[in-house]
């Protein structure tokens, strides 16, 4: 593991933001809070898609891949599919990347 030297201003900001005097632990706390915040944002967006379409992404994806519907070729629907899929992927990556955080 390599050591990281932070500028004094950043170190002070970390302490002020987290209340933790140890830089390393303060950075971990900040990362944890960031990950939680991003997950909350993603969950809000996911719920909006689920409410709009009345189903989970997995159900929507299965229907998308198995049925040929004219409305599925509309730009808005296709765009929603891609954005929804990106949110699901981003959520999984965040959960995996930050699973080690306390």
Give the positions of each predicted feature.
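Small, basic N-terminal interaction modules of short regulatory proteins
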Residues: 1-63, 92-102
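Short, contiguous alpha-helical
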Residues: 82-89, 94-95
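Short, glycine/alanine-rich amphipathic alpha-helical segment
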Residues: 68-83
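Solvent-exposed, flexible loop/coil residues
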Residues: 59, 64, 79, 86
């Amino acid at each position: 593991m390599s050591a990281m030297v932070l500028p004094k201003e950043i170190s002070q900001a970390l302490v002020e933001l987290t209340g933790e005097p140890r830089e390393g632990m303060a950075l971990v706390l900040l990362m944890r809070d960031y990950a939680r915040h991003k997950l909350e944002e993603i969950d809000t967006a996911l719920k909006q898609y689920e409410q709009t379409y009345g189903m989970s992404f997995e159900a929507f994806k299965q229907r998308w891949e198995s049925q040929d519907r004219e409305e599925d070729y509309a730009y808005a629907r296709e765009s929603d599919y891609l954005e929804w899929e990106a949110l699901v992927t981003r959520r999984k990556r965040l959960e995996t990347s930050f699973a080690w955080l306390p």
